[in-house]
C-alpha cells in the first residue's frame, strides 16, 4: 500500500490511449463522459491534472474522476481534481472508527483530515460532487451510523449521493449487503443529500476497443473488477471485431474455458450468481 504520488505509467502513453479510444468510440456513438478510475486510486497518479487538461484539448466531453477521496487534504490533489467536471469521492462513514473498519486506510491517513479535505474541495470547486456511499451490513447501516454520516454530508453538500452495496465478490467475507430495511432507512436519513439508490445490479456495456483478441479483452476488464458470467458472455458477443477477425467456429464458451484452464481466471459463486475473477485476486467468499 502506498500514499505517495508518482507516475505508474508513462503519461504520454495514457494520453495516446485516451485519444485513440475517444476517436474510435465517438465514430459510432455519443460519449457521455471520460472517467478516470484506475487499478487502484487515480489521485496517486502525479500527472492526473495534466491528463485531464490534455483530454479536454482532445474533445469537448465532460470529465469525471472516481476517487476514494483520501488525498483531498493535499492542495496539489485538489488543484488537479478542480479541472474535472465531476468528482466522485467515496465516504462510507461518519466516524473515524467505522471509516477504519470499512476502508482500512493507509496508516498516515487521518479521518478528520480526509473529511476536511472534502469540505475544502467543496468550497473551492465549481463542478459537481457525487459522493458514493457503500453500505456494509453491521458496520454503517444502523440509525446511529447513518445519522453520523448525514452530518458529514451536510458539510460537504454533494450534488448527488449514490448509495450502493457490495454487488461483486468482496475482499473480505464480512463485507455483505445490508437488509432491505436498512437500505430503506439509509434512503430516508440521507434524503437531504440528494440520494440516488443504485443498490441493484449494474447495467451497461464494457468497452473493448483496441483489443484484437477476445480473451485479452476479458482479462483487461476482470483485472479491474470481477464480472458476472452474463457480463462476460455479453461482452464477448458484442465485440466489434468478432465478425471480422475471429474464426467462423469461434465459441464464447471455449474462450472462457481456455482462460479458466490456463489459470488466468477462476469462477466464484456470490449471492447466488456466478462471477469470474483473475487468479491474482483474493476474495473472502471462496
Positions of the model-derived regions?
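Canonical Radical SAM [4Fe-4S] cluster-binding loop centered on the CxxxCxxC motif
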Residues: 1-13
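Well-ordered alpha-helical segments embedded in enzymatic catalytic cores
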Residues: 13, 17-20, 113, 117, ...
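Alpha-helix termini
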Residues: 22-28, 122-124, 241
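Conserved AdoMet/S-adenosylmethionine-binding subsite of the radical SAM
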Residues: 43-185
Amino acid at each position: 500500500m502506498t500514499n505517495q504520488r508518482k507516475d505508474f505509467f508513462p503519461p504520454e502513453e495514457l494520453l495516446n490511449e485516451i485519444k485513440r479510444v475517444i476517436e474510435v468510440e465517438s465514430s459510432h456513438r455519443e460519449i457521455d463522459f471520460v472517467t478516470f478510475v484506475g487499478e487502484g486510486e487515480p489521485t496517486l497518479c502525479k500527472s492526473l491534472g495534466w491528463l485531464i487538461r490534455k483530454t479536454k484539448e482532445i474533445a469537448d466531453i465532460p470529465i469525471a474522476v472516481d476517487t476514494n477521496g483520501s488525498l483531498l487534504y493535499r492542495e496539489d490533489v485538489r488543484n488537479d481534481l478542480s479541472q474535472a467536471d465531476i468528482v466522485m469521492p467515496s465516504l462510507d462513514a461518519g466516524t473515524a472508527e467505522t471509516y477504519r473498519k470499512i476502508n482500512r486506510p493507509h496508516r498516515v491517513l487521518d479521518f478528520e483530515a480526509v473529511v476536511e479535505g472534502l469540505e475544502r474541495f467543496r468550497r473551492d470547486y465549481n463542478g459537481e460532487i457525487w459522493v458514493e456511499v457503500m453500505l456494509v451490513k453491521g458496520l454503517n447501516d444502523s440509525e446511529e451510523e447513518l445519522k453520523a454520516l448525514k452530518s458529514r454530508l451536510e458539510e460537504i453538500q454533494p450534488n448527488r449521493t449514490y448509495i450502493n452495496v457490495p454487488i461483486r465478490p468482496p475482499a473480505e467475507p464480512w463485507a455483505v449487503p445490508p437488509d432491505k430495511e436498512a437500505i430503506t432507512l439509509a434512503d430516508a436519513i440521507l434524503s437531504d443529500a440528494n440520494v440516488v439508490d443504485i443498490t441493484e445490479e449494474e447495467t451497461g456495456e464494457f468497452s473493448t476497443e483496441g483489443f484484437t483478441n477476445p480473451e485479452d479483452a476479458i482479462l483487461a476488464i476482470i483485472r479491474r473488477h470481477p464480472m458476472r458470467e452474463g457480463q462476460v458472455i455479453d461482452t464477448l458477443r458484442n465485440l466489434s471485431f468478432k465478425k471480422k477477425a475471429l474464426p467462423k467456429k469461434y465459441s464464447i464458451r471455449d474462450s472462457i474455458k481456455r482462460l479458466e484452464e490456463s489459470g488466468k481466471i477462476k469462477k466464484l459463486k456470490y449471492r447466488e450468481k456466478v462471477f469470474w475473477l483473475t487468479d491474482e485476486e483474493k476474495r473472502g467468499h471462496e
